[in-house]
Regions:
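Short, well-ordered coil loops that connect the C-terminus of an alpha-helix to the N-terminus
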Residues: 52, 81-82, 212
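Short glycine/serine/threonine/alanine-rich loop segments
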Residues: 41, 52, 215
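Interdomain hinge/linker segments and adjacent boundary elements that couple functional modules
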Residues: 2-30, 34, 38, 43-48, ...
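C-terminal regulatory/effector modules of DNA-binding transcriptional regulators
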Residues: 195-296
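Key DNA-contact positions within bacterial/archaeal DNA-binding proteins
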Residues: 44, 54-56
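A ubiquitous short alpha-helical element
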Residues: 56-61, 256
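Alpha-helix initiation/capping motif
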Residues: 22, 53, 68, 111, ...
Length: 296
């Protein structure tokens, strides 16, 4: 993915992070909204420039629609306030928004409801996760992943999904890795997946990742008192590195996913913060993992 996204600071734009198409659309929409409002223009003004309905303009500014390059230039000309460098950056965002997805090679096993998450995860600066059933995807070994998937997927599909998950895990090992803060139920760690050899290798991997400075892993003990109820089970919170973009909540269901936003997202942040306080401290995680290993 190319470094094309922009952030406004002191009236100018500068390139500073790698964006996938989904995040590029979000940043482009936010910047165009900022230009529109700074110039005192209404949605009706944008509607007149693009000859598109107001509802579509609103979707554009939320990052849910894609503009042609000519349309970006037309809006900038109508709004004013974007110099040559700013226009070049916005056009770069528009190109990136139309670029092939990084996961395109796995399109055959990626359902539409999962596409936004794949883009947002790889662009996130902070990932906070609560997992009640299994080890979080980004912390799984390949053998553990295959054991999980082969339980309920055809062999070929399981292999493809395992390969995709392996690519996703690189986010923790790139030069500027994402920060991961995960809370895992002890019961999830005690569930056997793939036999003893697979389980031992998975625990060894978790012990290793506890030493990574950008990974915080906490365990919610079986005997945790007053553990906060979590309606719907596991969920993930994604924070983009751009302050103008909202946090994203991802809740996977049996045959789909939901992305709560606005007021609907607030309870998830309250819940993850309560879980962090209820779970054992991160400093105790390795000793808890060793205790579980001895029980296998």
């Amino acid at each position: 993915m190319s470094t094309v996204a922009a952030e406004q600071a002191g009236g100018g734009f500068h390139e500073e992070w790698e964006a996938g198409p989904t995040v590029a659309r979000m940043v482009l929409g936010a910047q165009l909204r900022r230009l529109r409002e700074a110039g005192g223009h209404s949605l009706e003004d944008a509607e007149a420039v693009l000859r598109r309905p107001r509802e579509w303009i609103s979707r554009l500014e939320l990052g849910r629609a894609v503009l042609r390059l000519r349309e970006v230039a037309d809006l900038c000309a109508a709004y004013g306030g974007a110099d040559r460098d700013a226009l070049a950056t916005l056009l770069g965002l528009a190109r990136q928004a139309n670029a092939p997805r990084w996961w395109a090679a796995y399109r055959d096993v990626v359902p539409p409801w999962y596409e936004p998450y794949l883009e947002l995860e790889q662009s996130a600066g902070l990932i906070r996760a609560y997992e009640a059933q299994v080890v979080p995807d980004l912390l799984q070994t390949e053998a553990y992943t295959r054991a999980l998937l082969e339980d309920h997927r055809p062999a070929g599909e399981a292999e493809r999904l395992a390969a995709l998950r392996a690519v996703r895990r690189r986010i923790l090992h790139r030069p500027s890795p994402a920060r991961l803060w995960a809370v895992i139920e002890e019961a999830a760690l005690r569930r056997g997946r793939g036999g003893r050899a697979v389980a031992f290798a998975q625990f060894e991997h978790l012990l290793d990742v506890c030493d990574l400075p950008h990974v915080t892993l906490q365990v919610l003990p079986l005997a945790a008192a007053e553990a906060p109820p979590v309606a719907g089970g596991s969920f993930t919170l994604l924070r983009p590195p751009q302050p103008e973009l909202p946090d994203v909540v991802y809740v996977e269901r049996l045959n789909g996913a939901v992305y709560p936003s606005g007021p609907d997202a607030v309870p998830y942040w309250h819940t993850i913060n309560r879980l962090v306080l209820t779970a054992a401290p991160a400093a105790a995680t390795q000793s808890i993992l060793w205790r579980i290993v001895r029980d296998l």
